[in-house]
């Protein structure tokens, strides 16, 4: 009898494993984390480099004002989907948008620290890093008579890389403006606002950070998702101030218990593989990269 029970248990485990391994991107959904505020992205500039910061703000402010920033986000989103083989995706037409820049004979360099797994802001195409952030900084370089050197590094190291770089340096990586990061770098004007989402199974969709309590949660190391879930696990929780329906400021506290397990990854693609295999229950990440990631056919 014991042998029969053991065989049954093994078969059940194998069936579960095969089911998990057979999951597809289409089995998952990205739901807005409704208990969080939206986040603002900025280009991180080496502290004290006022000339470079002004040049970045000139491009960012102009593109936001005339709608070109939205056009670039839409174009690179469509291109990332197309190159990844997303269902129904077609190659987008850039129209009048510049997608290549001529740095001429420039010798002075602006070093751009980024992390290429964050489409549409940065991703690999034909062996090169492209995307919204690279477009911004390419235009900045042309305006300043300089050229770009792109360094693809781990996301959580970017503020330190910018801080320690001896030359003109920026962090362009869909980076949320936070007080903690401001201690190391200066930030440009806001060029995009995003919400965090919870990526989870469609049949068990999760739409708040609080509902991650007791689950296995995946984040990219050093991102807002990492910082928020880490704070939520402390006694104080993740706190922010917002306005209620009467226009009064109120403090919101988001907490999860210590039973929550957090797995940190260098790239979201690795987190997705573990989600599909059942090693984690959800991913906490930015919305556009999540939608692009899930759109890929598999």
Can you annotate each of these PLM segments?
Residues 24-37, 157, 173-184, 228-232, ...:
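A ligand-binding cleft/hinge motif common to bilobed small-molecule-binding domains
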Residues 26, 145-147, 163-173, 215-216, ...:
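Alpha-to-beta junction loops
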Residues 27-36, 45, 138, 142, ...:
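Acidic, polar ligand-binding/catalytic clefts
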Residues 55, 63, 71, 75-76, ...:
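Extracytoplasmic small-molecule ligand-binding "clamshell" domains
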Residues 200-217, 232-241:
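Flexible hinge/capping segments at coil-to-helix
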């Amino acid at each position: 009898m014991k042998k029969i029970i053991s065989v049954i248990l093994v078969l059940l485990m194998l069936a579960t494993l095969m089911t998990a391994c057979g999951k597809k991107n289409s089995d998952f959904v990205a739901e807005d984390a409704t208990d969080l505020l939206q986040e603002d992205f900025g280009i991180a500039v080496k502290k004290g480099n006022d000339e470079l910061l002004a040049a970045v703000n000139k491009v960012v402010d102009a593109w936001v004002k005339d709608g070109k920033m939205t056009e670039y986000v839409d174009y690179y989103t469509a291109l990332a989907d197309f190159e990844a083989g997303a269902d129904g995706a077609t190659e987008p037409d850039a129209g009048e948008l510049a997608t290549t820049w001529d740095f001429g004979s420039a010798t002075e360099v602006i070093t751009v620290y980024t992390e290429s797994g964050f489409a549409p802001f940065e991703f690999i195409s034909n062996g090169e890093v492209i995307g919204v952030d690279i477009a911004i900084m390419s235009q900045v370089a042309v305006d300043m008579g300089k050229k770009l050197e792109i360094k693809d590094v781990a996301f959580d190291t970017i503020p330190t890389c910018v801080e320690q770089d001896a030359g003109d340096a920026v962090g362009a990586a869909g980076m949320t403006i936070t007080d903690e990061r401001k201690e190391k770098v200066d930030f440009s004007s806001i060029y995009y606002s995003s919400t965090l989402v919870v990526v989870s199974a469609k049949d068990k969709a999760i739409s708040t950070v609080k509902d991650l309590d007791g689950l296995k949660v995946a984040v990219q190391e050093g991102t807002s998702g990492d910082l928020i879930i880490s704070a939520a696990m402390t006694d104080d929780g993740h706190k922010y101030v917002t306005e209620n329906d009467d226009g009064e400021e109120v403090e919101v506290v988001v907490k999860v218990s210590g039973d929550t397990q957090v797995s940190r990854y260098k790239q979201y693609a690795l987190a997705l593989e573990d989600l599909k295999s059942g090693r984690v229950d959800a991913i906490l990440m930015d919305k556009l990269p999540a939608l692009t990631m899930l759109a890929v056919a598999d």
